[in-house]
Amino acid sequence: MFDILMYLFENYVHSEVEFLVDEDELTKELTRAGFHQAEIIKALTWLEGLAELQEAGTPYLCNHDQQSFRIYTKDELERIDVESRGFLLFLEQIKVLSVETREMVIDRVMQLDESSLNLDDLKWVILMVLFNAPGHESAYEQMEDLIFEQPDGRLHS
């Protein structure tokens, strides 16, 4: 499923090619690209879930304290390794992620069918979330810079 999300992001969203909005056409395109039907459905469902997070009624996106500290659940700790959690914290500290977008990222990570996620995969999920979050264009651009113009060495300590 993650491969399909990457394919869609790289070939449509990131390349600024007109995105196919017809789900049947998109499914046919992905099938021609070699993806399996079941994985295509999972990826499209994941994207629909991302779009639904934009709705104002999402409970964990309301009434938050900007000074709060995130405690991860057992399942989140198993899926998101220490390095990735540190990177999320780093992005919050430099204001690339807000409390809301961090929670959206964690929500989308937990909905992937991967048992664990590496830092590079997490970065792509963050890009997808920021791209789809209205009003976060600057954060998206900063994240792009962190990914594509990454200096040698670690980004955070």
Curated annotation (Swiss-Prot):
Domain of life, per UniProt, equals Bacteria
Could you tell me what this protein is called? Protein Smg homolog
Looking up HAMAP family in the UniProt record yields: Smg (MF_00598)
Report the NCBIfam families cross-referenced here: PRK03430.1 (NF002897)
Q: Which residues form a coiled coil?
A: none
Record-annotated disulphide pairs:
none
Q: Which organism is it from?
A: Shewanella piezotolerans (strain WP3 / JCM 13877)
One Pfam family cited in the UniProt record for this chain: DUF494
Gene name of the record: smg
Q: Which family does it belong to?
A: Belongs to the Smg family.
